[in-house]
Amino acid sequence: MATTAGAKKGLWSTIRRIAASDRISGLIMLGFALTGLVLANLPATAHAFETVAETHLFIPYTNLDLPIGHWAQDGLLTIFFLTVGLELKQELTTGSLANPKAAAVPMLCAVGGMIAPPILFLAVTALFSQIGPGEPGTLILTTTGSSIPFSEMSHGWAVPTATDIAFSLAVLALFAKALPGSIRAFLMTLATVDDLLAIILIAVFFSSINAWYWFIGIAVCAAIWAYLVRLKKVPWIAVGIVGILAWIMMFEAGVHPTLAGVLVGLLTPSREMHGELSPRAERYANKLQPFSALLALPIFALFATGVHFESMSPLLLASPLVIALIVALVVGKPLGIITTAWLSTHVGGLKMAKGLRVRDMIPAAVACGIGFTVSFLIASLAYKNAELSAEARFGVLVASLIAAAISGVLLSRQSKRFEKTAAAAAADEEDDESIDGDGIGQPSHTTEPTTPTEHPGTLADGTASVEIDFRH
């Protein structure tokens, strides 16, 4: 019995270590994303995959009757957003966002990184609508050849705004082992604010309010959650029921239900209480991390990229929508971040972290062009047209892979430079210690330094005096 318990504990520890590794969890999610794309387009598996994705599951006495693919997006992804909410609360209280002055540059860079991509996206799609093969003001979908008005295509402006922190950190972990921790801290702060802004975007632009009275229920659930998670002994069954009710009411209200996770996460205490050694928000986020990284995100990625294309060919890369997303994420994201960093430090008078220059952030800024999770979600919310949504998600996947590849090369080179600099500094330090230890450079004999000699004397009034002889 003890052996079984020990084995289970060991297995759970291994799972938590895998989930905590940005590199491994990022590669797992990428693997599921590519698997979804392959399964949806291989003749042998396409029908079975579509059947599973479109199988409906419903909850009695509610309007919840969704296909499995949507349950992955609206249900499972709530675990990820709950983890984000808990981490945000901790960062706002005791983490990188607790001191706005210290975090000012990455916070502003997050804003800049969300402004530039939509501008480039709209510029590229507008250009294609004028010079493309279709009628002026329209764009041609590569997959079906159908004509789409620019006004409809422009609904996807928010798709390239988000950064996938898990993938960005995975790229850093893979290619940037010798980089200073300040670069990772900068990226973490930027991505945290990016997540917050993406949540606001979804709430404001991609929610359709159905009935105001649901918000009363949401507020009641929020208040009960805030009370229950502050009790000395948390009643987890009651907390779970309240969380599920908040999710259902969000759905009924027309707000994207994953935001229920963010709401309750932000209401969780982030300081030590009842004599506990660590904040509850931090502990709960750590416990949820395996479910988020190894369950919710991979399954979501599987169905999000599992879109069927009638003609799966390299011509998809020539799609105006795909090109616009590649330009927006691969060029727009780093351009917005670096431009904002330069303006903040050279014009605004703000300072980067000690030892960091604006140009040091270029490789990490390119990594911020990895969209994935939230970009997939926004693509499915922004486009009601199934073909547009499919091409948008494909564009996000391609753009993210390109951004990951470019940032990987840049980070690897940057890491080698930092490694050489650190090695040279260490060698210089060893040489200095060797010189000091061996006495190299010291004179072969020493002469006693000339010092003044004191001759005490007495003044006429009897006061003691000192006569200093410099001739000695």
Curated annotation (Swiss-Prot):
Q: Which residues cross the membrane?
A: 24-44, 66-86, 108-128, 156-176, 196-216, 234-254, 290-310, 312-332, 361-381, 392-412
- Biased composition regions of type Acidic residues, renumbered to the chain: 427-436
Please list the GO terms describing molecular function.
Answer: sodium:proton antiporter activity
* GO cellular component assignments: plasma membrane
Tell me yes or no: is Nuclease among this UniProt entry's keywords.
no
Keyword Ion transport assigned: yes
InterPro entries from the xrefs? Na/H_antiporter_dom_sf, NhaA
Q: Where is the composition biased (Low complexity)?
A: 445-456
Q: How does it sit in the membrane?
A: Multi-pass membrane protein
Subcellular locations according to the entry: Cell membrane
Q: Which UniProt keyword terms apply here?
A: Antiport, Cell membrane, Ion transport, Membrane, Sodium, Sodium transport, Transmembrane, Transmembrane helix, Transport
Q: Where is this region: Disordered?
A: 422-472
Q: Which GO terms describe its biological process?
A: regulation of pH
Recorded catalytic activity of this chain's protein: Na(+)(in) + 2 H(+)(out) = Na(+)(out) + 2 H(+)(in)
Chief location category: membrane
Entry's Gene3D superfamilies?
Answer: Na+/H+ antiporter like domain
Q: Name a Pfam family for this protein.
A: Na_H_antiport_1
What's this protein's function? Na(+)/H(+) antiporter that extrudes sodium in exchange for external protons.
HAMAP family given for it? NhaA
- Homology family: Belongs to the NhaA Na(+)/H(+) (TC 2.A.33) antiporter family.
Its name, as the record gives it, is Na(+)/H(+) antiporter NhaA
Q: Write the lineage as a comma-separated list.
A: Bacteria, Bacillati, Actinomycetota, Actinomycetes, Bifidobacteriales
